[in-house]
Amino acid sequence: MAETPESQAALSTSSSTPADKDGSKICILLNATGNVPIIKKRTWTVDPNKTVGWIQTFIHKFLKLDASEQIFLYVNQTFAPAPDQIIKNLYECHGTNGKLVLYYCKNQAWG
């Protein structure tokens, strides 16, 4: 599947787009857990209508993992959201200090 300009722009660094200023995107903080490679840019902005599954796919591609490897996401080190969960809903319920904190790993850690 080829990357489209829309998919490339959907997840960006927190200080790069003017859309951040009008609040149309949600700031997420990605923290590595376990034996997964660390993403140096921890803070990203995401379209609020994206799903957890989309973020998992993005991380998988960004880290250039093998097709057999999985990525698990956890909200605030407590639970694994469903892949079809909308980021906006997670942010409204579990966002702190203007960010949604997500932990990613290659094996199950919590929940």
From Swiss-Prot:
Record region (Disordered): 1-22
Ranges of compositional bias, category Polar residues: 1-18
Highest taxon of the lineage: Eukaryota
MF-aspect GO terms: protein tag activity
Glycyl lysine isopeptide (Gly-Lys) (interchain with K-132 in APG5) cross-link site: G111
Assembly and binders: Conjugated to autophagy protein 5-like.
PANTHER family reported for this sequence: AUTOPHAGY PROTEIN 12 (PTHR13385), UBIQUITIN-LIKE PROTEIN ATG12 (PTHR13385:SF0)
Name of this chain's protein: Autophagy protein 12-like
Species: Drosophila melanogaster (Fruit fly)
Gene name tied to this protein: Atg12
